[in-house]
Design a protein with these regions (language model features):
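Extended, polar beta-sheet/loop recognition surfaces of beta-rich domains
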Residues: 37, 45-47, 51-58, 113-127
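Surface-exposed loops/turns
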Residues: 41, 47-48, 98-99
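Proline/serine/threonine-rich low-complexity linkers at boundaries of modular beta-sandwich domains
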Residues: 24-35
């Protein structure tokens, strides 16, 4: 095989590799995945006031994101999202909670345009 033929073959393989990596990289990088939360999933907290903090692997659009509190009686309450300095974090505050099983339902919009959702169950207890 001539050196021009080898170069052409190498060039085609390199272009294909660059294309595949760029497509996969964009796809994998953009989805919002919850890295950590407070309260923690399955954890318990002491009432009545509970700070809420959700940290994601990518920045999220806070203006188009939602937080809801699922109450022990199955009622749902919208939670306000407080402005925060970190673009990968959503913050809110729960007040006046009584002992029982709750969950925070979240929905976020990632930079790639995909919506991610999840729930964080937790228990509120007295001291």
């Amino acid at each position: 095989m001539s050196s021009i033929g080898r170069f052409t073959r190498f060039f085609r393989i390199a272009l294909l590799l660059i294309f595949v990596l760029s497509v996969l990289g964009t796809h994998l990088e953009g989805h919002a995945i919850l890295k950590s939360s407070s309260p923690a999933s399955g954890g318990s907290v002491i009432r009545p006031d509970v700070p809420v903090k959700l940290i994601f692997n990518v920045r999220v659009d806070a203006a188009r994101s939602k937080l809801q509190l699922l109450m022990p009686d199955a009622a749902t309450v919208e939670l306000p999202i407080v402005k925060w300095s970190s673009p990968d974090t959503l913050v809110s505050k729960l007040t006046g909670l009584k002992p029982g099983a709750y969950a925070i339902r979240w929905q976020v919009l990632a930079p790639d345009g995909h919506i991610s959702r999840g729930e964080i169950p937790f228990t509120v207890r007295n001291r």
